[in-house]
From Swiss-Prot:
This is Biotin synthase. One of its GO terms (biological process) is biotin biosynthetic process. Its EC number is 2.8.1.6. Its cofactor is [4Fe-4S] cluster; [2Fe-2S] cluster. The gene is bioB. It catalyses: (4R,5S)-dethiobiotin + (sulfur carrier)-SH + 2 reduced [2Fe-2S]-[ferredoxin] + 2 S-adenosyl-L-methionine = (sulfur carrier)-H + biotin + 2 5'-deoxyadenosine + 2 L-methionine + 2 oxidized [2Fe-2S]-[ferredoxin].
Length: 326
């Protein structure tokens, strides 16, 4: 069987409602370079078949930029590293509502509230709940949250407030995780995802590629994501932050990024697969190729500690390649 025939066989499994195996995924991730376009094309056909031409466009609000207690080696907001990043406390509900309204007017269909802490204190959680209530009452945009570790009570409260989706990234493969973070475990992250799922929240999870992991470890992360089967996968591409242990990390080749997104699509045909942080910095085309290689979502107008494309530019890019953003 030729490589192209194998790719098509895997695609047919997906179209037939079956799952490809871990062995299939490994072979797909390791296909020869000359077949990479075949892999991307078939992943794109899966995306269109299961999800249509719509691209999920999201905006973030880093509502608390903090000196976080965790030592994640990629993060410019960790208190362990001297990165010179400005910190600030939770803004007023009025400030967040204004930004959420602007995001809606710019074509975002979801608005994610993100906070840099291990987990929310009781006081901070109550403030976030008030912000969510105000957005629901005054804006009417789909609210998502990324607030760190959750208790069962907090997850239930978010569900009661009509939060659609909870983000909590695995960050990397389990075998790589101890090199990336020592202040909590991989199991801690899985536990929070389970709590969110049990409360009825949709899941958004993923990680960062380009941390120095091997291709095998990217496969490991991908298979764990497939096991969780989240409604949304978010993949960041490392942008090294000066002052962090990964400040000198070399860029991941574009072909490795395409492989990752394409194989995730074979494993998760129905999920939103979102190109997140590092899109503009690492991809010369700002994601055009990936949106035709398995991805069907982007974050626009900036990230947690860095800027990004203006929404208008991203919507134009989506339309340029024949897809729809609204």
């Amino acid at each position: 069987m030729s490589t192209l025939e194998f790719i098509k066989e895997c695609q047919e499994k997906v179209f037939s409602g079956n799952h490809i195996t871990a062995e299939d995924a490994e072979k797909l991730l390791n296909i020869p370079e000359e077949n990479l376009k075949d892999l991307a094309r078939c992943a794109n056909e899966i995306t269109r078949d299961f999800n249509g031409e719509k691209v999920d466009v999201e905006q973030l609000n880093n509502i608390k930029k903090n000196a976080c207690s965790e030592d994640c080696t990629f993060c410019g907001q960790s208190a362990f590293f001297d990165t010179g990043i400005e910190t600030y406390q939770l803004p007023s509900p009025e400030e967040v509502v204004s930004k959420a309204q602007k995001a809606k007017e710019e074509g975002a269909e979801s608005y994610c509230l993100v906070a840099a802490w291990r987990e929310p204190s009781r006081t901070d959680f109550e403030k976030v709940c008030k912000i969510i209530t105000e957005i629901n009452d005054k804006v009417g945009i789909s609210v998502e949250c990324s607030l760190g570790f959750l208790t069962q009570e907090q997850a239930k409260k978010l569900k009661d407030l009509k939060v659609k989706r909870y983000n909590h990234n695995l960050e990397t493969a389990k075998s790589k995780f101890p090199e990336i973070c020592t202040t909590h475990t991989y199991e801690d992250r899985l536990e929070t995802l389970g709590i969110a799922r049990d409360a009825g929240l949709e899941l958004c999870t993923g990680g960062i590629i380009g941390l120095g992991e091997t291709r095998e470890q990217r496969l490991e992360l991908t298979l764990e994501l497939a096991r969780l089967y989240p409604e949304e996968v978010t993949i960041n591409i490392l942008v090294p932050v000066p002052g962090t242990p990964l400040e000198l990390q070399t860029d991941l080749p574009n072909s490795e990024i395409v492989r990752m997104f394409s194989v995730i699509r074979f494993l998760l045909p129905e999920s939103v697969i979102k190109i997140s942080g590092g899109r503009e910095t690492n991809l010369e085309d700002s994601g055009e190729e990936l949106l035709q290689s398995g991805a069907n979502g982007i974050i626009t107008s900036g990230y947690l500690t860095m800027g990004g494309n203006e929404a208008q530019k991203d919507h134009a890019m989506i339309e340029k390649i024949g897809l729809k953003s609204q």
